[in-house]
């Protein structure tokens, strides 16, 4: 029987508490990150370092990402859950991850938690996914306080993503997106 595991893209920064939480839920967590020292620090900070595995690769480099994912999937099968915060500078990274998972196994369901910035909410893009992918979208909004607004903190983002995972809603908004003209600049 394979271990439950999660693949987290963007886990060394604002999603690090999501990584810690997944470990507390008995997942083996594989974190894709460009910076080996940040991956090492994340591992040192977790309560079960043996369950956190850094994958040092720049997801903007499709060839390197593909090689690392091939090794990971060959060893572990497909992940139970993918948590993805990918910058717009790498538009090919998420489609590559989805395609590689679907080539491995179309019979096992997996969840994709796709985290996007507030501006994506207006676009309502269609994100194609394989038939065995349970797609969930999380929009990161902002906080209104004292007639002003601010962006979400890393803790607020992580809490919102964890809420999205536990409730399994198709769409989650962390913070608020309205009124739109109150977004921080």
Question: What do these predicted ranges mean?
Answer:
Residues 1-30:
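Canonical Rossmann dinucleotide-binding motif of NAD(H)/NADP(H)-dependent dehydrogenases/reductases
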Residues 11, 34, 117:
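Cofactor-binding loop segments of dinucleotide-utilizing enzymes, especially the Rossmann-like FAD-
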Residues 26-41:
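Conserved glycine-rich Rossmann-like NAD(P)H-binding loop of the short-chain dehydrogenase/reductase
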Residues 29, 52, 135:
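Hydrophobic anchor at the start of a short beta-strand
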Residues 38, 63, 69, 73, ...:
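Rossmann-like short-chain dehydrogenase/reductase
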Residues 40-42, 123-125, 145-151:
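Short, charged, surface-exposed secondary-structure boundary motifs
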Residues 46-64, 84-87:
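Rossmann-fold cofactor-recognition segment
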Residues 143-184:
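C-terminal helical subdomain
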């Amino acid at each position: 029987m394979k271990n439950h595991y999660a693949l987290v893209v963007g886990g060394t920064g604002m999603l690090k508490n999501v990584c810690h939480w997944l470990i507390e839920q008995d997942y083996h967590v594989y974190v894709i990150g460009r910076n080996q020292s940040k991956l090492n620090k994340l591992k040192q900070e977790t309560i079960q370092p043996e369950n956190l595995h850094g994958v040092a690769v720049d997801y903007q480099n499709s060839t390197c990402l593909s090689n690392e994912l091939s090794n990971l999937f060959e060893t572990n099968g497909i992940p139970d859950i993918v948590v993805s915060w990918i910058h717009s500078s790498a538009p090919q990274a998420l489609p590559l991850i989805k395609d590689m998972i679907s080539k491995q196994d179309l019979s096992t369901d997996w969840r994709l938690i796709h985290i996007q910035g507030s501006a994506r909410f207006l676009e309502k893009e269609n994100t194609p996914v394989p038939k065995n992918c349970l797609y969930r979208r999380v929009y990161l909004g902002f906080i209104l306080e004292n007639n002003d607004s601010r962006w979400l903190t890393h803790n607020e983002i992580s809490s919102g993503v964890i809420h999205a995972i536990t409730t399994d809603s198709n769409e989650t908004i962390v913070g608020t997106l309205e009124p739109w003209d109150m977004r921080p600049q």
